[in-house]
From Swiss-Prot:
<keyword id="KW-0413">Isomerase</keyword>
<comment type="function">
    <text>Catalyzes the interconversion of L-rhamnose and L-rhamnulose.</text>
</comment>
<comment type="pathway">
    <text>Carbohydrate degradation; L-rhamnose degradation; glycerone phosphate from L-rhamnose: step 1/3.</text>
</comment>
<feature type="binding site">
    <location>
        <position position="296"/>
    </location>
    <ligand>
        <name>Mn(2+)</name>
    </ligand>
</feature>
<keyword id="KW-0684">Rhamnose metabolism</keyword>
<dbReference type="GO" id="GO:0019324">
    <property type="term" value="P:L-lyxose metabolic process"/>
</dbReference>
<comment type="similarity">
    <text>Belongs to the rhamnose isomerase family.</text>
</comment>
<keyword id="KW-0464">Manganese</keyword>
<dbReference type="InterPro" id="IPR009308">
    <property type="entry name" value="Rhamnose_isomerase"/>
</dbReference>
<protein>
    <recommendedName>
        <fullName>L-rhamnose isomerase</fullName>
        <ecNumber>5.3.1.14</ecNumber>
    </recommendedName>
</protein>
<keyword id="KW-0963">Cytoplasm</keyword>
<feature type="binding site">
    <location>
        <position position="262"/>
    </location>
    <ligand>
        <name>Mn(2+)</name>
    </ligand>
</feature>
<feature type="binding site">
    <location>
        <position position="294"/>
    </location>
    <ligand>
        <name>Mn(2+)</name>
    </ligand>
</feature>
<dbReference type="InterPro" id="IPR050337">
    <property type="entry name" value="L-rhamnose_isomerase"/>
</dbReference>
<dbReference type="GO" id="GO:0008740">
    <property type="term" value="F:L-rhamnose isomerase activity"/>
</dbReference>
<comment type="subunit">
    <text>Homotetramer.</text>
</comment>
<dbReference type="GO" id="GO:0019301">
    <property type="term" value="P:rhamnose catabolic process"/>
</dbReference>
């Protein structure tokens, strides 16, 4: 440890102690908050089922930065490289299209066997795994409908895919000793004016009930459902709207997924957390950065990321909120994208843990909004960076931008050879 780092750390401890914050306790709490990294940043949501197929479902990965992962071994190597540069506990979030098999596997026939390599890798790296059925980029989703499809045969295919995915998720939780959160998102919707908005939602309701009908151990598996405002090609009507899924999660007591990019640009999910927590047992967050639409830009340490973290910490939601990331930028180094976004999420959590929340609540209750605003703003100038650097030091990760040199070296030695 350098003398400069030690001095900054000691000063930070004193400064935060002056406002009633124990920085050691803050770091202990930060180690209680794993962030689930999304595998699909590493290959632009291509997966291994049909890597050359086109991405559908109203989502886009833009850019053509060289060196994307072409198979599971490369993707795991890239993830390991990124994770070495991110301090603290982490998980990995997988989609069903990241299965491994020597022969083609229909999505309604996936089994834990197709993901055993991921489980062994997770064990070796002390990671939890989360999961998602992949209801997109498939011939049977080509017309824009899956679980709400009017064709019974097609709808049943997607029901069976989601049921098979739940068993994979439960396998993850059983093997790794930590529950897998399995999130269901579907692209179902219509491009233009929709006459019958009710029937697809009735079909989706019944389909979801069938999907979750098999009772699984909650210590191994958690169901979550995710809404969206619109997607490309589904601008006018989305079957799985916010109202639909909030009602579903409330009535069925599943987890609700809030994605930062899945609402109107004037809405923020930080404001939705406390409301939803009154009705649903758990929340899954997809922290992202929408630029004018659900563009899934790399997460910044911006006001909304900070507000999301603050809501979790201020209301002590550590055991009820699962933090995941969801972005995919193919225009920059993909490992750097993981590192930047995940470190920013963890920085936001640390800053939230260093807030004198009890004092702020006292001022708010007393109606002293002047002091509340003053303290909130002065808090931003306290030396949280020194606490972050110590956290990185203790987890053997680079504290500052020197992590970028590690990425550049990996890019030169590994990524550049992929073509």
């Amino acid at each position: 440890m350098t003398t400069q780092l030690e001095q900054a750390w000691e000063l930070a401890k004193q400064r935060f102690a002056a406002v009633g914050i124990d920085v050691e306790e803050a770091l202990r709490q930060l180690d209680r908050l794993p962030v689930s990294m999304h595998c699909w940043q590493g290959d632009d949501v291509s997966g291994f089922e049909n890597p050359e197929g086109s991405l559908t479902g109203g989502i886009q990965a833009t850019g053509n930065y060289p060196g994307k992962a072409r198979n599971a071994s490369e993707l795991r190597a890239d993830l390991e490289q990124a994770m070495r540069l991110i301090p603290g506990p982490k998980r990995l979030n997988l989609h069903a299209i990241y299965l491994e098999s020597d022969t083609p596997v229909s999505r309604d026939q996936i089994t834990p066997e197709h993901f055993k390599n991921w489980v062994e890798w997770a064990k070796a790296n002390q990671l939890g795994l989360d999961f998602n059925p992949s209801c997109f980029s498939h011939p049977l989703s080509a017309d824009g409908f899956t679980l709400s499809h009017a064709d019974d045969r097609i709808r049943q295919f997607w029901i069976d895919h989601c049921k098979a995915s739940r068993r994979v998720s439960a396998y993850f939780g059983e093997q790794l000793g930590t529950p897998s959160v399995m999130n269901i998102w579907i692209p179902d919707g219509m491009k233009d004016i929709t006459v019958d908005r009710l029937a697809p939602r009735q079909r989706l309701l019944a389909a979801l009930d069938e999907v979750i009908s098999e009772k699984l151990n909650p210590a191994h598996h958690i169901d979550a459902v995710e809404s969206k405002l619109f997607g490309i090609g589904a601008e006018s009507y989305t079957v799985g709207s916010n109202e639909f899924y909030l009602g579903y999660a409330t009535s069925r007591q599943t987890a609700l997924c809030l994605d930062a990019g899945h609402f109107h640009p004037t809405e923020v999910i930080s404001d939705k957390i406390s409301a939803a927590m009154l009705y649903v047992p758990q929340l899954l967050l997809h922290v992202s950065r929408p630029v004018r639409w659900d563009s899934d830009h790399v997460v910044l340490l911006d006001d909304e990321t900070q507000a999301i973290a603050s809501e979790i910490v201020r209301h002590d939601l550590f055991d009820r909120v699962h933090i995941g990331l969801d972005f995919f930028d193919a225009s920059i180094n993909r490992i750097a994208a993981w590192v930047i976004g995940t470190r920013n999420m963890k920085k936001a959590l640390l800053r939230a843990l260093l807030e004198p929340t009890a004092e702020l609540r006292k001022l708010e209750s007393a109606g002293d909004y002047t002091a509340r605003l003053a303290l909130l703003e002065e808090q931003k100038s306290l030396p949280w960076q020194a606490v972050w650097e110590m956290y990185c030091q203790r987890h053997d990760t680079p504290a500052g931008s020197e992590w970028l040199e590690n990425v550049r070296t990996y890019e030169k030695e590994i990524l550049s050879r992929r073509g």
